[in-house]
Amino acid sequence: ELKGQDVGGEAGGDRAEPTRFKGPAVETISFEADLDATDQLEFPDQHAATVAHGLAPQIALLESLSQPSSAQLSKVNSQASSGQLEIAPMLAPLLLLVWGASRVIPVELTSVSVTGEACDPVLNPIHAKASFGLRVLTVDDLGFASKGGALFMTYLQNREQLAAKAQPVSLSTLGVTGV
């Protein structure tokens, strides 16, 4: 979903400037993924970790992307206990959604939901569905000089190049005349 950031389009906005942008659009991406350990379980000698834990390590990794690490939390607690004040929030890693070589997108994970659908005899998940909500991070979030900002600009330029390949349609083709 793309939501334009125009100057006059929102309540309280400048109605005299409805066609001016104030920054990149707010873009959100949602998708689902099927996680399945069946193929790995077919060759147990080659996939001992999957036999021992199923999909639990992959699920734990996905879930860990949405919160600070225990080490970060312990450090903040230790600093607070010693009277130090941390003003800046804890840094999250720069997440990239890679949909091919021309679509490398810096994103923030806004939601992740994993539903286990099948387990092995010791209740390790072996089939699950994961739903993701992402917000594309732009130069407004990351700045132009950062690696993430440069990746966003490349993503935007690649999209513009793709859009330029679309065949234009005249208004008369759509039945509009006299404009």
Where are these regions (language model features)?
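Acidic, Ser/Thr- and Gly-enriched intrinsically disordered low-complexity segments
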Residues: 1-179
